[in-house]
């Protein structure tokens, strides 16, 4: 089955054919480090984290580069507000970024370059553009002449005149044309600056990524990614510079994730309607945010709300419980099956895996892939509910449940980065806590299972867990009594 992805450049879904298989070169634009990352940043990070995992599953050798913009007007302004230097601000928020990434389970990129570490490479790119006549110097500033690049607008599907009329461009009296953009900015008092052939200054935003791609990946890469809001002007300007220098395609495929909105408005710091990743992962398990992102197709807008987080939490718990329930089922009476042949779950797992990967191969359709996940969860729940109602499970059913739940767990870990803190043999105390909090203790069969779990904990000298089960049962009106003949239980009067 071939992978097909939507290419912003062509405007259609195309078969993915790498330049030099099995190697795949990917670059995505990283954050400007002047504040904490918000859910909008998190969506892009999660989308490309999962896409990278899927490519690796397909057997590709992925080299993934994601940069830091660590010198910028916003960083400089933040430094002035705090009466410190820009690098202190950048270092602080890069450190906090790494904490955020660990907490939302996003793997580090293979290379994570900083702009300030690539000033010579940036200057080299600008020099080539000046030499080729695509850039001009005015009083220490250097600008790219947009009209000199004939293919300008091919990514955003707009012509030059339309762009001039409607684009957000940075005005300047020094520009020859309103659409021209800065490659190098002459130094200003109190701002960071580096030596260059045009005098002291600092790089413009659009040149940084070109220089870092050239250095770490080469002149043409397989995939360039980022948020939809970067198509114009940022990615359009990257194409203009890179292809003006090399005469080659800068990237074969351009992938853009949709924006995160709040009440229909783009989530952004300028509008003040943002929610930081820290706010989310201090309230919810990181898998809940990952699931929220994956429940929406990567190219569609995602409207964030705390209500949606609550809905997603329920979906997360349903998935997690289906896997953890294996431990409870093992505590039931296991009887020999009288049925022959393999259990239907084995075929359902095969069907799940085929459909799951087919959905991801069709323009990375994660919501459709998740529909197959929850179909399998439903089949697991049928087996579980039957066993609970009968107070026993056949060896045939238990083996099939174990096979299916472990298959599901491995797929979720490997591809979606979900349930990474669960193991095939799930911790009994976690299952016990969930069942107790669900208030299901008056089911006699379940009480016996919990007593058995407590006995195991005592035998293994995990007294914290044993005491937790006893105390929690007591809170819910069940009193345990340890006797030479075993543990007995009774309902507390009035319970």
From Swiss-Prot:
ATP binds at residue 269. One of its GO terms (biological process) is cysteinyl-tRNA aminoacylation. One of its GO terms (cellular component) is cytoplasm. Transmembrane segments: none annotated. Binds 1 zinc ion per subunit. It comes from the Bacteria. A motif ('HIGH' region) lies at residues 31-41. Zn(2+) binds at residues 29, 209, 234, 238. SMART domains: DALR_2. One of its GO terms (molecular function) is cysteine-tRNA ligase activity. A motif ('KMSKS' region) lies at residues 266-270. It is found in: Cytoplasm. Keywords: Aminoacyl-tRNA synthetase, ATP-binding, Cytoplasm, Ligase, Metal-binding, Nucleotide-binding, Protein biosynthesis, Zinc. Its EC number is 6.1.1.16. Its cofactor is Zn(2+). InterPro entries: Cys-tRNA-ligase, Cys-tRNA-synt_Ia_DALR, Cys-tRNA/MSH_ligase, CysS_C, Rossmann-like_a/b/a_fold, tRNA-synt_1_cat_dom, tRNAsynth_Ia_anticodon-bd. It catalyses: tRNA(Cys) + L-cysteine + ATP = L-cysteinyl-tRNA(Cys) + AMP + diphosphate. Its main location: cytoplasm. PANTHER family: CYSTEINE--TRNA LIGASE, CYTOPLASMIC, CYSTEINYL-TRNA SYNTHETASE. Belongs to the class-I aminoacyl-tRNA synthetase family. Monomer. This is Cysteine--tRNA ligase. It comes from Aquifex aeolicus (strain VF5). The lineage of its organism: Bacteria, Pseudomonadati, Aquificota, Aquificia, Aquificales. The gene is cysS.
